[in-house]
């Protein structure tokens, strides 16, 4: 099929006075919808000059791997995930890792019932102030933290602006790795972990 990409350029002035071109981007396909395969790992990684990403026309029904899907996309301020079908996804490791310009994420439509790996999922999302994950089904998750004695890990690691985090629905009965899960979340003042096993 055909992949279609629309974009709108705009000049942005940085705090140091320099300017650079940033883009808003929309993706679609024939009949308006673009169907993906099973592996979306790194699909939108390193989008440093894209501010807005509209994925409402992306059919994600068959994806099982969303690891690092938006990895280090530090320019992103907004992602439309309203039509994301995540019912077959097993791997969300590092999905939003390093999306340091995102101020918010609406994940209310996410079905995480098959996901086993959420390590680094929101790591270094340093601008996000609130995350409501009350709809997350984590009953099959085994990894939320660093499974190794070296390197980086932790589902919310260095989310330094995060003030509100709702993980009240988390089922951690199968989780083996939680180390560094909240490391560097220096703005969190309260956290309800009463359901954690």
What does each of the following model-derived ranges do?
Residues 1-197:
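Negatively charged
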């Amino acid at each position: 099929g055909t992949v279609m990409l629309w974009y709108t350029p705009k000049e942005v002035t940085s705090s140091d006075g320099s300017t650079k071109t940033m883009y808003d981007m929309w993706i679609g396909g024939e009949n308006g919808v673009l169907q993906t395969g099973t592996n979306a790992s790194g699909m939108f990684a390193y989008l440093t000059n894209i501010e807005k990403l509209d994925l409402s026309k992306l059919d994600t029904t068959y994806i099982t791997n969303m690891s690092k899907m938006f990895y280090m996309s530090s320019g992103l301020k907004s992602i439309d995930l309203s039509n994301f079908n995540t019912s077959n996804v097993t791997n969300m490791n590092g999905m939003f890792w390093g999306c340091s310009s995102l101020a918010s994420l609406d994940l209310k439509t996410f079905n995480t019932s098959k996901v086993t790996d959420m390590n680094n999922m929101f790591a270094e999302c340093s601008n996000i102030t609130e995350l409501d994950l009350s709809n997350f089904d984590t009953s099959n998750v085994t990894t939320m933290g660093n499974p190794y004695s070296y390197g980086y890990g932790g589902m919310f690691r260095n989310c330094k602006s995060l003030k509100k985090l709702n993980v009240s629905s988390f089922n951690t009965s199968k989780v083996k790795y939680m180390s560094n899960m909240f490391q560097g979340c220096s703005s969190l003042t309260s956290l309800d972990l009463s359901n954690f096993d």
